[in-house]
């Protein structure tokens, strides 16, 4: 549908955690059936062998470090990563490891600005930040957050900036739709199909 864009499929939880064989099959389906151009895998050193196997199978891989949502339970929730010197060093080392393993790009999520900046400046592959400050090579936000698909009562993460209030617009439209149906104001003749009057009369007589 969009031949000029690079489509990266985010591999779901457990699709690359069990063994290399399953990981290859699942990633291969994204490429062959889903028409993705690449896949994204969360994690650092523990994902090294999977990443290498995918790349050996000619499947481009994007890495993902920092706050990795699929590991949030082990992390104690959605918490910023790399806030101590030792943890920042570990992130830096894992970023280099992913680059050496063959990743063509990397997402850095939920890490201090200075950590993401240091990693970005020392890698030769591009970094994409989400909650990682402004010094990464690119930026991303979840589309639902960006356009405001959730109620204002929902507390967004600190790094989210709403560029719209789609929730309000959607709710307004749905309520108007409901009202029109209940009052028989929709559908009208404008939204309905007709047939020839002679056929219509014959149908009524039949």
Kindly label every feature range from the protein language model.
Residues 1-164, 168-206:
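Alpha/beta enzyme core
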């Amino acid at each position: 549908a969009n031949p000029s864009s690079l489509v990266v499929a985010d591999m779901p939880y457990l699709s690359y955690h069990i063994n290399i064989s399953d990981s290859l099959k699942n990633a291969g389906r994204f490429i062959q059936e889903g028409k993705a151009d690449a896949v994204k895998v969360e994690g650092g050193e523990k994902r090294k062998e999977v990443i290498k196997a995918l790349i050996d199978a000619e499947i481009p891989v994007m890495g993902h470090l920092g706050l990795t949502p699929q590991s949030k339970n082990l992390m104690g929730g959605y918490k910023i990563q790399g806030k101590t010197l030792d943890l920042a060093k570990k992130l830096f080392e894992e970023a280099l490891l992913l680059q050496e393993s063959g990743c063509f790009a990397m997402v850095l999520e939920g890490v201090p600005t200075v950590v993401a900046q240091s990693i970005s400046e020392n890698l030769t592959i591009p970094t994409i930040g989400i909650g990682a400050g402004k010094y990464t090579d690119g930026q991303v936000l979840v589309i639902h957050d960006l356009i405001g698909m959730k109620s204002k009562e929902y507390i967004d993460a600190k790094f989210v900036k709403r560029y719209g209030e789609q929730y309000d617009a959607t709710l307004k439209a749905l309520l108007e739709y409901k009202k029109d149906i209940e009052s028989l104001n929709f559908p009208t003749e404008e939204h309905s199909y007709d047939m020839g009057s002679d056929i219509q009369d014959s149908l009524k007589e039949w």
